[in-house]
Structure formats: structure tokens, C-alpha cells
Amino acid sequence: MLTAHHLDVARRHHAILRNLSLSIEPGRVTALLGRNGAGKSTLLKTFAGELTGGVAPNGVRVTGDITLNGEPLARIDAPRLACLRAVLPQAAQPAFPFSVDEIVLLGRYPHARRSGATSHRDRDIAWCALERAGADALVGRDVTTLSGGELARVQFARVLAQLWPDDEAIESGPRYLLLDEPTAALDLSHQHRLLETVRAVAREWQLGVLAIVHDPNLAARHADTIAMLADGTIVAHGSPRDVMTPAHIAQCYGFAVKMVETGDGAPPVMVPA
């Protein structure tokens, strides 16, 4: 399990996260919801090990405990951490004309037998990851020529390749996938396809997934658990049906909604009141 316990994060004198506790369970998808600036990306970066205890040069101070499979996250060295968790950050336009294949193969570098060397097995995994991400038609393309949605699918394939299961991965214990707005650049169809894939690999590979999602309806449709972040802490946490209520939405977003049942057994859909 990937766990934050009594986490506080502040930048100089501004508190971002306050006494926050949250666990990401293997085999389940947790969607993180909250307003812009609520601290969602900060929480994800802390889970990723990008923000560690003490005071960083940029003035960010982190206190509290983060553990991965019971081990303090700060004690896990970078090579081993890269085999235990993968991070998909918010989309950024690439500066160099790498090929799609090269970008996805980056996900295999933590597993290379020697520095910078990838094997036929790694290339096979990269191809399978592209297929799983619905990006196999983009093989050979220059990533600087891709649309935002195409690039998002390629980067998703990269993190799938990084966590692709093998005997060593199984022996290392549960692994984790951290996604920062993975659907932001995607059209409606690809949003649902990506999150369907996320939920499928979470179950098949026993991945713990934390995904920042801006659309509460999308999160409710595809997540096992929803965590709502407001005022620097988790204000609601549980199943989509339990968490997606007008009261919780108002507390999290300051916006009045009503819930409409879809009739297909899925959680209700949120619409403006």
C-alpha cells in the first residue's frame, strides 16, 4: 500500500496540505478531485517521491510520513523506486524530435540490465504497451508532430511499459501508477477508453492507482474510490456512490448540483442544480 500519514506541505508561509492521510490500495483506482489550486498535484508529487521531508531549495517544506509497501518512501533509492511506481505528469510539449517508439522505450530503462541498454523483450513490451494505450498506429512518428491527445496516449503507453508485469515485478511487491490529469487532452471517446484501461490494468496487474481527474462524472464512472480535496485535506473519501453527493460537491467545489440516476447501475451523474 502507498500511504500518506499526517502529511503537511507548505511553500514558505502558505500551507498547501494540512494533516492529510490517504492510502492507495493495490488493485484499485482512486480518483482525486478538487478545485484548481487545491493541492492535488502537490499530493501526487509527494506520493511520487518528488517532494521529500525537510525544506527544499524552492521553499517547500514537507512533514509527515509516506510509506510504500510499509517502507519509508525517502529510503527507497531512485532506481528501485522507478521499478515500483510510474508517474504520468501533466502534458508538456516535447522539445526534441524523438520517435514515439523511443519515448515509450524510456519506460523500460529502469529495467535495463546495463545502463541505457534495452532488449528485444523491452521492445516487445513497448509495442504491447502502445497497443494497450491505443497508440500503436503512431509508431515511428516524430512526437513533436503529434496532437495533444496523441501525445497523451503515447505518454500513457510509456508508463504502462514501465510497470509491465514480469517475474521480477511480481517479486518486488505491489506497484503504483500516479496519473496527473491523464484525460485532459483527450476527446470523449479516448477519455473513457483510457480510464477503462487504467481500471483493467489495476485489477490484472494489482496496481494501486491514484488519478487526478477534473470531471467528477468521469471519475465516478471509472474509479473504485474517490477522494475529495479541499482546504488542504481530504473532506470526503469512499465509493463513488457514497462520495458523489450534492453536499460533498458543494464542500469541495463551492457549486450547487443535483444527482441524476442513469438507470444502468452506475453511480448517479452530477448536473447543475
UniProtKB/Swiss-Prot annotation:
Q: Which stretches make up the ABC transporter domain?
A: 2-256
Q: Where in the cell is it found?
A: Cell inner membrane
Q: Which GO terms describe its cellular component?
A: plasma membrane
EC category = translocase
* An MF annotation (GO) of this entry: ATP hydrolysis activity
Q: Which UniProt keywords apply?
A: ATP-binding, Cell inner membrane, Cell membrane, Membrane, Nucleotide-binding, Translocase, Transport
Q: What is its EC number?
A: 7.6.2.-
Question: Binding of ATP: at which residues?
Answer: 34-41
Lineage, top-rank taxon, reads: Bacteria
Show the Pfam families listed in the entry. Answer: ABC_tran (PF00005)
Q: How does it sit in the membrane?
A: Peripheral membrane protein
Q: Which CDD domains match?
A: ABC_Iron-Siderophores_B12_Hemin
Q: How does it assemble?
A: The complex is composed of two ATP-binding proteins (HmuV), two transmembrane proteins (HmuU) and a solute-binding protein (HmuT).
Record's family?
Answer: Belongs to the ABC transporter superfamily. Heme (hemin) importer (TC 3.A.1.14.5) family.
Q: Its function? A: Part of the ABC transporter complex HmuTUV involved in hemin import. Responsible for energy coupling to the transport system.
This chain belongs to the protein called Hemin import ATP-binding protein HmuV
Organism of provenance: Burkholderia lata (strain ATCC 17760 / DSM 23089 / LMG 22485 / NCIMB 9086 / R18194 / 383)
**Lineage of producing organism:** Bacteria, Pseudomonadati, Pseudomonadota, Betaproteobacteria, Burkholderiales
